[in-house]
């Protein structure tokens, strides 16, 4: 039997946060950083319980949902969620903006850009990525993925 159902798409990440991090100043800091670096904006939380901060990514139905909670989520330093960019220049521009922000706010964490190539039977794949963190318990991995026919880089 052939399955013609399209696979479901990931549409959001929900993270519980220390309520003190999501006070008025904390929300302003989160909105400023993620707005400046990633272009994310505050979404409408009307009707939501617990006064979450919703960061919309600009793509329809995709968002990061930050909910004040006690206890908040804790995670090891490399736990993350990922976003995919279409152009390598976009990835480098995001890193440049994050480094600019880091120059005046030491809460910004950046793991520098790294590329690796995986060899497949018919194609090779080059994954370029970086990790960026700011006050959330999870970092954001920014990825750019290119598929190459064998012998064509």
Where are these regions (language model features)?
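Vicinal oxygen chelate
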Residues: 1-23, 73-153
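Core segments of cupin and vicinal oxygen chelate
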Residues: 15-63
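A short, hydrophobic/aromatic-rich structural module that often spans a beta strand
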Residues: 43, 47-91
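Intrinsically disordered, low-complexity segments enriched in polar/charged residues with Gly/Pro
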Residues: 39-43, 70, 116-120
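Short, well-ordered turn and helix-capping elements at secondary-structure junctions
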Residues: 17-19, 67-70, 114-117
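Short C-terminal domain-edge/linker segments immediately following a structured domain
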Residues: 43-48, 86-87, 95-100, 112-116
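Residues that cap or initiate secondary-structure elements
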Residues: 19-23, 61, 89, 138, ...
């Amino acid at each position: 039997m052939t399955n013609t159902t399209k696979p479901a798409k990931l549409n959001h990440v929900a993270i519980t946060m220390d309520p003190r991090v999501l006070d008025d100043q904390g929300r302003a800091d989160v909105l400023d950083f993620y707005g400046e670096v990633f272009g994310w904006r505050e979404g409408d939380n009307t009707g939501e319980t617990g006064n979450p901060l919703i960061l919309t990514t600009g793509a329809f139905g995709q968002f990061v949902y930050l909910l004040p909670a006690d206890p908040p989520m804790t995670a090891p330093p490399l736990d993350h969620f990922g976003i995919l960019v279409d152009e390598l220049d976009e990835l480098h521009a995001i890193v440049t903006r994050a480094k600019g922000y880091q120059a005046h706010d030491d809460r910004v964490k950046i793991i520098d850009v790294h590329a690796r190539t995986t060899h497949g039977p018919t194609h090779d794949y080059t994954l370029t990525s970086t990790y960026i963190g700011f006050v959330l318990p999870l970092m954001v991995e920014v990825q750019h993925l290119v598929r190459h026919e064998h012998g064509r880089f």
